[in-house]
Amino acid sequence: MTHTLILLRHGESEWNAKNLFTGWVDVNLTEKGRAEAVRGGELMREAGVLPDVVHTSVQRRAINTACLALDAADRHWIPVRRSWRLNERHYGALQGKNKKETLEAYGEEQFMLWRRSFDVPPPPIEEDSEFSQFGLPQYAGLGDDMPHTECLKDVIARFLPYWESDIVPDLRAGHTVLIAAHGNSLRALVKHLDGISDEDIAGLNIPTGMPLVYELDDDFRPTVPHGRYLDPEAAAAAAAAVANQGR
């Protein structure tokens, strides 16, 4: 028996368009991003790959992407479950900063360490920063789990317990699962699924609004490594654009 998993990064956000580090800042989709989300749902419908349940973050750009995609796929009625564990990586003190200006200020090596390394987090955010999430009601119960900054290793550490406790049981029950989330939370899961090394994960870029489908065996490992995009040519072009952010 195989289990179908669909990964969908949110459509272009307002801060994607401005080339800003976003992280946990709760920005909305652009009109382009809304169109990308709708197209993602259309691709699922056209391919006949239709989810029965959705898992998403508590950030509006992912939640709204899920809603728009589901409506386009005529699956607006299925359950949607939200968890902070699917949030984007927290970019610490980089949140709100322009990527190009950060690259120019700190140089290529430091920029790429902060942006794409496995275990080097950016400097921590101050709790009273305008780009901090401390004190927001959606995070009231986190306590010591509330991050000041994260690297990809940290995202994996918070994501995988939810994967095992909530998503795997849905897959095991025979549901087709859609995860509508973020570039780095999805990179964290793909690293786990495909066994990508700590070094090679730096080269993985996930484009906005492009459904990526995995068929998993009974051990929840891919039957075909790296899955398949429902629109592979468009996904490849969009992933290249993600790689060039900051330039």
Curated annotation (Swiss-Prot):
- Protein name, UniProt field: 2,3-bisphosphoglycerate-dependent phosphoglycerate mutase
* Site location (Transition state stabilizer): 182
What chemistry does it catalyse, as a reaction equation?
(2R)-2-phosphoglycerate = (2R)-3-phosphoglycerate
Which gene name does the record give? Answer: gpmA
What this chain does, per the entry, is described as: Catalyzes the interconversion of 2-phosphoglycerate and 3-phosphoglycerate.
The biological process GO terms on file are: gluconeogenesis; glycolytic process
Provide the binding site for substrate: 9-16, 22-23, 61, 88-91, 99, 115-116, 183-184
Q: Which UniProt keywords apply?
A: Gluconeogenesis, Glycolysis, Isomerase
Q: Where does this protein act, in terms of pathway?
A: Carbohydrate degradation; glycolysis; pyruvate from D-glyceraldehyde 3-phosphate: step 3/5
Active site, UniProt feature: 10 (tele-phosphohistidine intermediate), 88 (proton donor/acceptor)
Q: Which family does it belong to?
A: Belongs to the phosphoglycerate mutase family. BPG-dependent PGAM subfamily.
The molecular function terms of the Gene Ontology recorded here are: phosphoglycerate mutase activity
Enzyme Commission no: 5.4.2.11
Could you tell me which InterPro entries the record lists for this protein? His_Pase_superF_clade-1 (IPR013078), His_PPase_superfam (IPR029033), PG/BPGM_mutase_AS (IPR001345), Phosphogly_mut1 (IPR005952)
Top EC class for this record: isomerase
